[in-house]
Amino acid sequence: MKASLIISVYKDTRALRAVLDSLKQQTEQDIEVIISEDGEDTKMAEFIRQYDFLWPMQHLTQPDEGWRKERALNRAVVTAKSDWLIFIDGDCVLHPRFIEWHVRMRQRGVMQAGKRVKLSPQLSERMLQGDNICFFPYLFWHRGCRYVEEAFYCGLAQWLRRPVKHLVGSNMSMSRTDLMAINGFDENYTLPATGEDYDIEWRMQANGCRIVSLRNLAVQYHLYHKENWQEQERNMIYCRAQQAKNAYVCKNGIHP
């Protein structure tokens, strides 16, 4: 297989169905799917049991004890059968060529970074009901959508690269070997944001890796939900302390 797709989920089976349905439309299907659940929700387990998967699939759970996404991701990394890991969230629907580009451009020493358009509540509902709106780009100008420029697929983007400054945890891929070299995700992050993307970014860069842009190639549609970043600064305080020490191999990761 060419890649292991790791999908982070928490309770929202309706969004996950939309994501998995978009996965069935991919031009590249030589993957395994790992559903990485930060919890043990019975409705999630029942949905996964009944869903018609087209790919090898593993469902990993852990006790719901607050935000422990980094721990869930580390367990998925260890379980993965491919050396190329693609990370997405369970509320991000995929353009049909999403997997193709993450696989096509893969190489050791590289972190691949895409972006996402944030959908309005109305467009999110249409996607949840099964509408394939990615082929109707004018819809993304709907009031309430954000980062609309990220909604458009353009094959020419492989030559006319729009740079990215940072990883986004819902749209990134990298070598399992490279990620293991920094001991995976730092499980000291117990709040949303930073730990699943920016922290990985600076530590892998410190270990010699670089970012390659997949903007407008690996396109992703983020379903609407309320977001709360009020506690992000606590994560950044810890992150800056680790950067000051150049501690790019975390102590509380895959191997404690």
Give the role of each language-model region.
Residues D21-D30:
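Short, acidic, metal-binding catalytic loop of nucleotide-sugar glycosyltransferases
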Residues D30-E40, Q58-Q62:
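Short beta-strand/loop segment that forms part of the nucleotide-sugar
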Residues E37-F47, C92:
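A conserved acidic beta->alpha catalytic loop
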Residues P63-A80:
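Glycine-rich, basic loop-to-helix element that forms the pyrophosphate-binding segment
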Residues L85:
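Short aromatic/hydrophobic "clamp" motif used to bind/position activated sugar donors
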Residues R97-F136:
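Conserved donor NDP-sugar-binding/catalytic core segment of glycosyltransferases
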Residues N132-V164:
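Short, flexible, basic/aromatic active-site loop/helix in glycosyltransferases
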Residues N171-N183, T190-C209:
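A short, conserved alpha-helix in the catalytic core of glycosyltransferases
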